[in-house]
């Protein structure tokens, strides 16, 4: 039984389909790291991870220690990589929970080494290389080769992987992404010349998987990191139009009408006088607000699906509630409203919502609050 009259519906068949789409694109002998950061982009990290592991994922990727610990409590043996920065103070928890960490400096590696030795354990690390994102990482040059040699000499560390991140592989013209891969491959080859090898070599996110697996840029890669495509979205609308791979929507945001009331002409609905009733108006109240992840700016800007009919979201979205106009809509209290997700029910999908707000589907779904229950179908 639901604890609230609003929830996130997650289509598990679509999760499986999208993972299969990844497997159909990457090389047959490749490993796959399912990226489940930000609560699996809103889908629920535990259940999504369980499904991806059942479908053949070799690794799970997250952004923070807390995300990794949540997964570790459910998956005791599964490899988990924290792709984001791990503060030195977290070193002991990384070691104690058998988590893999991203590193990008000798100083960080030395701290992790000391903590691993103190615990009489080994900490797995993946070295980040900056090939053009200019966010985190060692630069692919001779100095970094010397740094990697010093890191490899540290006791207590298992240098499991090396990786980079593509910043613009969803662009129509792939010059920058290909230049990044050219730099990464050249660096890997220089390391090989020095007899430095890694169990895992990875670079391709969803955009890379969808657009760069047909060339030879990935010839040295053996691990792939799908993220947004697992949840049914293409990294950009342009890529959706040009990509033959079919992805299926996973996430729908739903709520029930908890009260219907008639408001006379000449009244304001909600905070701030943002919707004026120029006629007698039938208003449905939903127990869903911006604290749940329904962005406040969507008030007076979208239509929602109710019984295969479209009704406007009116007034400003409140922290915990919002309003729909039900004039000429067949609806009753308790009926389900789809804020976004299921296109077959006439609802907007998350990418359309994002376009209205000059953002992306990633933000629309990953900001869905944990206080919303996830209902898996």
From Swiss-Prot:
CDD domains: PLPDE_III_AR. The modification N6-(pyridoxal phosphate)lysine is found at residue 37. Keywords: Isomerase, Pyridoxal phosphate. One of its GO terms (biological process) is D-alanine biosynthetic process. It catalyses: L-alanine = D-alanine. It holds the Pfam family Ala_racemase_C. Pathway: Amino-acid biosynthesis; D-alanine biosynthesis; D-alanine from L-alanine: step 1/1. Its EC number is 5.1.1.1. It comes from the Bacteria. One of its GO terms (molecular function) is pyridoxal phosphate binding. PROSITE patterns: ALANINE_RACEMASE. Catalyzes the interconversion of L-alanine and D-alanine. May also act on other amino acids. HAMAP family: Ala_racemase. This is Alanine racemase. It comes from Helicobacter pylori (strain ATCC 700392 / 26695) (Campylobacter pylori).
